[in-house]
Amino acid sequence: MTEPSLPRVGTGVDVHPFEQGRECWVACLLWPGETGLAGHSDGDVASHAACDALLTASGIGDLGAVFGTGRPEWSGASGAALLGETARLLAEGGWLIGNVAVQVVGNRPRMAARRVEAQEAMSAALGAPVNLSATTTDGLGLTGRGEGLAAIATALVTRV
């Protein structure tokens, strides 16, 4: 049976705790003066959630399977590098990326002033449109207490 060429949607989530002494990379941008995020790579929750959503939508796998701690070659990798490799994997698998929407959840860094710059950086790294928004949890949970940062992403892909 031939699979219909309908669009597919994937969701991705990523959460990292803050870690003193690390640079803060979120949405492919360096945030000077902000505490960095712990992680196997750069801790860029926005890029990681976007990759996870794309990998899920395409059925290739998930962030942990493709870039996880069992893959030492990705240790310390940038969110931009992960987005680029994810785009390559999808293209190799016959997928076209429609777009990705990412919402960053946390108190810091404040995304509003650099939102357009972040969208442009993520879109350039991925080679497809990325839209970004941000919110807080009004003091609730680990992001509300300022212990870390989270991101949720939705991706749309279609077969080429």
Curated annotation (Swiss-Prot):
Positions annotated to bind 4-CDP-2-C-methyl-D-erythritol 2-phosphate: D14, V15, H16, H40, S41, D62, L63, G64, T135, T136, T137, D138, R145
Catalytic activity: 4-CDP-2-C-methyl-D-erythritol 2-phosphate = 2-C-methyl-D-erythritol 2,4-cyclic diphosphate + CMP
GO biological process: isopentenyl diphosphate biosynthetic process, methylerythritol 4-phosphate pathway; terpenoid biosynthetic process
Cofactor: a divalent metal cation
Record-marked site positions (Transition state stabilizer): H40, T136
Keyword annotations of the record: Isoprene biosynthesis, Lyase, Metal-binding
InterPro entries: MECDP_synthase, MECDP_synthase_sf
Free-text remark on how the cofactor is bound: Binds 1 divalent metal cation per subunit.
Pathway in which the depicted protein is active: Isoprenoid biosynthesis; isopentenyl diphosphate biosynthesis via DXP pathway; isopentenyl diphosphate from 1-deoxy-D-xylulose 5-phosphate: step 4/6
Residue stretches in coiled coil: none
Any one Gene Ontology molecular-function term assigned to this protein's record: 2-C-methyl-D-erythritol 2,4-cyclodiphosphate synthase activity
Binding site for a divalent metal cation: D14, H16, H48
EC number: 4.6.1.12
Gene3D superfamilies cross-referenced by the UniProt entry: 2-C-methyl-D-erythritol 2,4-cyclodiphosphate synthase (3.30.1330.50)
Entry's family note: Belongs to the IspF family.
Its job: Involved in the biosynthesis of isopentenyl diphosphate (IPP) and dimethylallyl diphosphate (DMAPP), two major building blocks of isoprenoid compounds. Catalyzes the conversion of 4-diphosphocytidyl-2-C-methyl-D-erythritol 2-phosphate (CDP-ME2P) to 2-C-methyl-D-erythritol 2,4-cyclodiphosphate (ME-CPP) with a corresponding release of cytidine 5-monophosphate (CMP).
Protein name, UniProt field: 2-C-methyl-D-erythritol 2,4-cyclodiphosphate synthase
Source organism (scientific name): Parafrankia sp. (strain EAN1pec)
Gene designation per UniProt: ispF
